[in-house]
From Swiss-Prot:
Protein family according to the UniProt entry: Belongs to the GPI family.
Pathway as given in its UniProt record: Carbohydrate biosynthesis; gluconeogenesis; Carbohydrate degradation; glycolysis; D-glyceraldehyde 3-phosphate and glycerone phosphate from D-glucose: step 2/4
Broad enzyme group: isomerase
Pfam families to which the protein is assigned, alphabetical: PGI
Annotated organism of origin: Burkholderia pseudomallei (strain K96243)
Protein name according to UniProt: Glucose-6-phosphate isomerase
Alphabetical keyword list: Cytoplasm, Gluconeogenesis, Glycolysis, Isomerase
One GO BP annotation of this record: gluconeogenesis
CDD domains: SIS_PGI_1, SIS_PGI_2
PANTHER family named in the record: GLUCOSE-6-PHOSPHATE ISOMERASE
Gene name in the database record: pgi
Active site: 350, 381, 503
Subcellular location, record wording: Cytoplasm
EC id: 5.3.1.9
Amino acid sequence: MTLNSLPVWPALQAHYEEIRDAHLRDWFAPANDRAPTRAERFTFEGGGLAADFSKNRLTDATLALLVRLAREAGVEARRDAMFAGETVNPTEGRAALHTALRANAPDAPFQAQVAAERAKMARFADAVRSGAWTGYTGKRIRHVVNIGIGGSDLGPKMVVHALHHVATPDIATHFVSNVDGADLARVLERIDPEATLAIIVSKTFTTLETMTNARSLRDWFVANGCPEGALAKHFVGVSANPAEVVKFGIAEANVFEMWDWVGGRYSLWSAVGLSIMIAIGPERFDELLAGARDMDEHFRTAPLERNLPVLQGLVGIWYRNFFGAQSYLVAPYSEALHYLPSYLQQLEMESNGKSARIDGAFVDYPTSAVTWGEPGTNGQHAFFQMLHQGPTLVPIDFIAVLTPEHPLASHHPKLLANCFAQSEALMLGRTLDEARKIVGPAKPELAPHLTFPGNRPTTTLLVDALTPRTLGALIALYEHKVLVQAAVWNINPFDQWGVELGKILGKVVEADLTAAQVDPAKHDSSTSALIARARKALGE
C-alpha cells in the first residue's frame, strides 16, 4: 500500500487545492462562526484532556476526508493488532506492548510478569524512600543517579522533572546519559558516595554510553571508600539481559527486568521508570499508569472523528504531506514540562523517521517531521519571531496547564495569557492596512515590518492540573499519535535501524584514535583528517 494510491487521496489533493489559500481569520468571522462556534465544533476531549483544533487550517470536510484516510490506511487494524500483542514490529519479529505495562486487566498480555515486576519495584522503592535501604555505612539514600540513554533516560527524566511537586524532598534524582565525561563529572560533584544509589538502565547492558558511565561511577564509589563487596548496596540494574547485569557486578537480587516486547522509547512505564517510582512513590506511579490507561481506552473506543490521538496524527499528516511542513513545534506553557519536547523528539523521529515501508519498498512521500520545542514563555523570546513573520510554515502544539502546581499562583494568569495570546496572534496576523494605521503618516516605510501573515496553524491541548494521571494521559496521547501516523505512512514505528551504522563505525573510529598506527586509506579523506587532528590533540 502506498499513501498516494489510496482511493481518498485524489479527493484530499483536490480539497487541499480548494482551501490552501483560505485564511483562518475568515473562518472565525462572525458570519462563519455561528452556534455551534468553530471552537465548539473543533474541540474534543478524551483521557482527561481537551484539544482545541479550531485554529488549524481545516474544515469539517477536511476532517471527514482525513478520517476516511485513516480508515483506508488501516489505522484501526494496526491499533487493534498492537493492543492484542500481535507482531507489529516485523523487522525485529516483536510485539509492541507498552500498553500492557499499564493495562491492569487479567486478560491483557503478560500481566503476571508485569504485576510481579511492578510489585518488586514497589517493595524496593518503599525501602529506599523509608530509609530501610541504606548505603554501605548505614546512611539513608539521599541521591539516586539514573544512568541510561535514549528511552532509558529521556522518559524518566521528563517525568521526574514534571512531577517534582509531588516527589519526595528527601531524595534528589540525577540523570546521566552522555558519554562526554562532563555529564557524569557534574553529578559526581553533588553526590555523597555513602548516600547514593545508582540505577543502570540498558536493555542489552552493552550500550556504549551507559556502560562507560556505569564503570566510571563504580570506580568512583571504590575510590571514595566503598568496598567492592558493598557495591550491592549502591547499584541496581534494569535490563532485558540479566546475565550481563550480573556479569557487570550487580547482585542478581538487584536486577529488574524489562522485556524485548517494549521499545526503549515506550518503556518508562516498566522498570525503566524505577527512578520515577522512587521519586514519587508507588501509589503515584500507579496514577501515572492509570492516566496512560485512560488514554489507551479512549484511543481504543472513541470514534475516529472524536479520537484525540487519531486527530492529532491526521492533522500532522495534513501539514506534512499536503502543506509541506518540515517541522512542528511543541510549546508547553509549563516549566514542569521542560523536558517534554526532548522526549517527543525521540518518540516521534526515532519512531517515524523512516524511508522504507513495512513491505520493504521505499516511500515516495515525506514521513516524520522534525520535532522541536521549548517551554513558554522562553520560546517567545527566542524563535517566535520566525513563527510569526518568517516564510516557513511551522504547525504548533501549545500545551496549557490551567491550574499551577506551585505556590506562586499570581504568575499563572500571565503564563496562560501568553499562551492563548500567541495562538490568537498566529491565527489572526496583522494586515498591511492595519499596520499602516498603527504607524500613521509619519513612518509609512515601517508598515511592512509590522505586518504578520497570520494563518499559522496551532492546536491547544488543555490540562486541568498537572498530576501523575494527567501526565500519563498526555504521554500516551503522543505515543498513539505516532502509531496513527505510522499506519498512514505504512512504516514500522517500533524499530530504529538508523542508529546502527553510526555505532558500528564509531567502534572503528574509537580504535583508530588510540591505535599505534592508522591506515589513512581506511576512511574517507575528511574522516581521516578529523582522526589525525584528534590523535594529535590526545597525544597519540
